């Protein structure tokens, strides 16, 4: 049995993730359209975080799929995309680890040519190469790229289109899933609809203790 606290928490989670995916998607798509690729790569890095968060919450949200085959199938279709997004977030946004950077430098030796280092476009090439390295390091058990099934070079237009299409499909599928999930939650969400109830909740609010428990204690 799902209680009101769970419904409220999940409602907040869904609204935040949905808004982030929507606004980030519009922003990096617009940047790509006007060929502002530095801004596009920067926004993509931010965009991975919302998808990664959604992936981490699928287990929490799975309780809403019981008896709802359509929502269950939408969640299943998202899993592979969100697993890939989580990898990109970890490698390209959350952790700038030594191994990935070393792979990026090996993959793009021109990063440290004098001409490139002194160019105003140096950061663009760094963003691009780190993203490629993160994409290509998402491997299956045979050492092949796990999602695209080929090595990706974002300077190669078909590869760039494949990646942008992946991001667009991920946005559409995620928004569709989140909209359906939101509808399920709202059916059971008890809203404050009279002054007496509001005053009661305000009294409870005045007793809020903002100290958070320490982990491991």
Residue ranges, per PLM feature:
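Amphipathic alpha-helical interface segments
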Residues: 1-84, 99-102, 108-111, 117-217
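Long, charged low-complexity segments
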Residues: 87-90, 94
């Amino acid at each position: 049995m799902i209680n009101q606290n769970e419904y409220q928490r999940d409602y907040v989670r869904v609204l935040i993730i949905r808004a982030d995916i929507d606004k980030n998607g519009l922003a990096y798509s617009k940047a790509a359209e006007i060929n502002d690729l530095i801004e596009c790569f920067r926004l993509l890095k931010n965009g991975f975080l919302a998808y990664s968060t959604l992936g981490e919450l699928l287990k929490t949200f799975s309780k809403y799929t019981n008896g709802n085959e359509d929502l269950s199938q939408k969640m299943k279709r998202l899993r592979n995309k969100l697993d890939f997004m989580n990898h990109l977030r970890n490698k390209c946004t959350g952790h700038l680890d030594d191994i990935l950077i070393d792979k990026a430098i090996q993959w793009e030796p021109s990063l440290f040519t004098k001409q490139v280092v002194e160019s105003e476009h140096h950061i663009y090439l760094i963003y691009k190469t780190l993203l490629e390295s993160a994409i290509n390091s998402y491997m299956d058990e045979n050492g092949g790229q796990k999602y695209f099934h080929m090595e990706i070079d974002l300077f190669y237009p078909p590869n760039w289109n494949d990646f942008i299409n992946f991001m667009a499909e991920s946005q559409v599928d995620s928004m569709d899933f989140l909209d359906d999930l939101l509808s399920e939650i709202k059916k059971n969400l008890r809203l404050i609809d009279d002054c007496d109830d509001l005053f009661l909740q305000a009294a409870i609010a005045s007793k809020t203790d903002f100290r958070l428990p320490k982990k491991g204690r």
